[in-house]
A protein has these predicted regions:
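Conserved N-terminal beta-strand and adjoining loop/helix that marks the start
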Residues: 1-14, 87
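A conserved beta-turn-beta hairpin within the catalytic core of GNAT-like acetyltransferases
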Residues: 23-26
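NUDIX/MutT-family hydrolases
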Residues: 85-87, 96-128
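Active-site-adjacent beta-strand/loop module that shapes the phosphate/pyrophosphate-binding cleft
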Residues: 67-94
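The catalytic Nudix box helix
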Residues: 30-63, 86
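Acidic/histidine-enriched, glycine/proline-rich intrinsically disordered or flexible terminal extensions
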Residues: 131-136
Length: 136
């Protein structure tokens, strides 16, 4: 499955969503999700952010392409994602959780490790904080 994610920064904060459905229900993640048939990657990231957070965004550029394979307890692959993560700028809307996100919140960089979040997601976020000024 091809998916997109959005890194949306506000000074020393990043917008995070808490997942409301499996996989990784209750874990925190970047807003994003699956690309629908006929949709461009940028259309998909704008739609997913709008659905999950209520915000309108402008994708500024691709930060990373990330592959994730989630396995069941027996080691059999259950989910295989190729994720394209964009650095984005919020351009409008009102923050509110929606669709499959149970919460949408701005999180300060030092508080990220307090959340239930995958190491892979943390790595992408740190890369985003380090490189975000390259995206205008």
């Amino acid at each position: 499955m091809v998916g997109v994610g959005a890194l949306i920064f506000d000074r020393n904060r990043i917008l995070m969503t808490q997942r409301g459905k499996e996989p990784l229900k209750d874990w925190w993640s970047l807003p994003g999700g699956a690309v629908e048939t006929g949709e461009t990657l940028e259309e998909a990231v704008r739609r997913e952010v709008r659905e999950e957070t209520g915000l309108e965004i402008k994708p500024l550029g691709v930060l990373e392409i990330f592959e994730r394979i989630l396995r069941d307890p027996a080691g059999v692959p259950e989910y295989h994602y190729v994720l394209i993560d964009y650095v984005c700028r919020a351009t409008g809307g009102d923050l509110r959780a929606g669709d499959d996100a149970q919460r949408a919140e701005w999180v300060r960089r030092p508080d990220l490790r307090k959340l239930q979040i995958t190491e892979g997601t943390l790595g992408v976020i740190e890369k985003g904080f380090q490189n975000r000024r390259k995206y205008r």
